[in-house]
A protein has these predicted regions:
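Terminal helix-turn-helix DNA-binding modules in bacterial transcription factors
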Residues: 163-176, 195-240, 246-249, 253-269
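Jelly-roll (double-stranded beta-helix
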Residues: 22-24, 98-103, 125-130, 148, ...
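Amphipathic alpha-helical segments enriched in hydrophobic/aromatic residues interleaved with Lys/Arg
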Residues: 93-152
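Solvent-exposed, amphipathic alpha-helical segments
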Residues: 109-123, 157-168, 212, 216-220
Length: 269
């Protein structure tokens, strides 16, 4: 069964077409980004030709974009990120640019969408609005790079946002919340945050959660499942994956390591 997940202003959906087919003309109410995962897929626009997608090509469709879908021989599998109007209003940076359909044969646009798909397929519990907004900012920033501005000096709000995430990594913050507090567009916020701190906002939040979990694991006797929830992870498996990415060690092994007080030699420094 195709995978689907609705979170706040977003819908993440997989579509599987097993056979060659030409669908009748249709249009959707909401803007969306589509990634062709495998197979052959083409959108036919009456009177305007068509756009043929190869695997890992990404496309954008504005609301009410009338078209027909043609699935090639052997079928196709696609991933779509749908934006409710509130999300579209926050993120789509140039009305003129986003009023027409777009197609990108570009890894920087495709890979954040692909990461959302792999999370949907393997660990949907780890997805939340903050992570989705961070990935969407990557997509839009790459697709619209020639319209993005770069800061030459570190804005004060970068450190303010960093402190907000560090102080409350387990909270319900969103990228759009932090951008609004900074007085900048969400795409500019995410790009500038990474420019000066070297990581995406969601990566920074992940590290802050791991740090909180480390403190709880060594200073309390809470079961690791409760440590995970207290630090903001969806569950213990979510925390274990994050520990592996950030520290290269499992939470249980980290706790055991720091609770082993046997002397290993003279103290240094």
């Amino acid at each position: 069964m195709p995978r689907r997940l609705a979170i706040r202003d977003f819908l993440l959906a997989e579509a599987i077409h097993r056979d060659e087919c030409l669908y009748p003309e249709h249009a959707f109410a909401h803007a969306h980004f589509t990634l062709l995962l495998k197979g052959s897929f083409e959108e036919v626009v009456p009177g305007r030709g068509s756009r043929h997608m190869r695997p890992l090509d990404a496309a954008f469709s504005p609301p009410s974009f009338a078209h027909r879908d043609r699935v090639g021989r052997g079928g196709a599998r696609l991933f779509t990120l749908w934006l409710q109007q509130s999300a579209a209003d926050e993120f789509l940076v140039s009305a003129d640019f986003w009023h027409v359909p777009r197609l990108w044969e570009s890894a920087p646009v495709a890979l954040p969408l692909l990461r959302l798909y792999t999370e949907l397929a393997t660990a949907p519990q780890s997805l939340d609005p903050f992570e989705i907004e961070d990935r969407l900012a990557q997509v839009i920033g790459s697709a619209h790079a020639h319209h993005c501005t770069h800061e030459t000096r570190r804005p004060r709000w970068v450190d303010g946002a960093r402190e907000r995430i560090s102080d409350c990594p387990h909270g319900a913050l969103r990228v759009t919340d932090l951008a609004r507090e900074a007085g900048v567009h969400p795409v500019h916020f995410a790009r500038t945050f990474r420019q000066f701190l070297g990581v995406r906002p969601a990566e920074y939040r992940c590290r802050a959660r791991v740090a909180m979990a480390c403190r709880l694991a060594t200073s309390t006797t809470l079961p690791l499942s409760q440590v995970a929830l207290a630090a903001g992870f969806a569950d213990q498996s979510h925390m274990t994956r994050a520990f592996g990415r950030v520290l290269g060690i499992a939470p249980a092994a980290y706790r055991a390591l720091l609770r082993d007080d046997r002397s290993t030699g003279p103290a240094r420094g």
